[in-house]
A protein has these predicted regions:
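Short, structured segments at the rim of ligand-binding sites
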Residues: 1-146
Length: 146
């Protein structure tokens, strides 16, 4: 889809890139890291995502890379995301949801991708997001449960 508006991630004055990391309450919720990561794939600019609190929560990024996202998994806790700036779309694919957090990120990626994606093990997403298909459909998403 063609986009007229977008969003930019701005580097710091010294040229270093923005880093987003999770922390205990009242800090940034670790449950939102995967959503921020997939959203950053379409931004203008780069961001370092740092998952400090949990091991291996970023291991779903290989699925996003398969879809065309520019992500470098630095280690089990950090991923560098280079945004597309809506210049290229993610590509549809078949994938499996490993858990709730990764599943919702993959669902967001699938909704923004060109083509039809299929997410296996979607029950993982249901555990954290009640009636997600119906709620997204009400917002205008082209989504169905098969």
């Amino acid at each position: 889809p063609e986009h007229n508006d977008g969003y930019s991630i701005v580097n710091f004055i010294d040229g270093s890139i923005l880093s987003i990391s999770d922390s205990p309450w009242p800090g940034f919720s670790p449950d939102l890291i995967s959503i921020i990561l997939v959203t950053a794939t379409q931004a203008n600019g780069s961001v370092l995502i740092h998952q400090k609190m949990f091991e291996s929560r970023l291991f779903f990024v290989d699925k996003l890379i398969d879809m065309g996202a520019k992500i470098i998994l630095c280690d089990p806790h950090r991923a560098s995301v280079i945004g597309h700036n809506f210049k290229s779309s993610l590509k549809a694919t078949n994938m499996t949801s490993p858990d709730i957090r990764a599943g919702i990120a993959l669902l967001i990626a699938a909704l923004s991708a060109n083509g039809v994606s299929v997410i296996q093990n979607a029950e993982q997403i249901d555990r954290g997001y009640e009636d997600i298909v119906e709620r997204l459909r009400e917002l205008g998403a082209d989504i169905e449960r098969i």
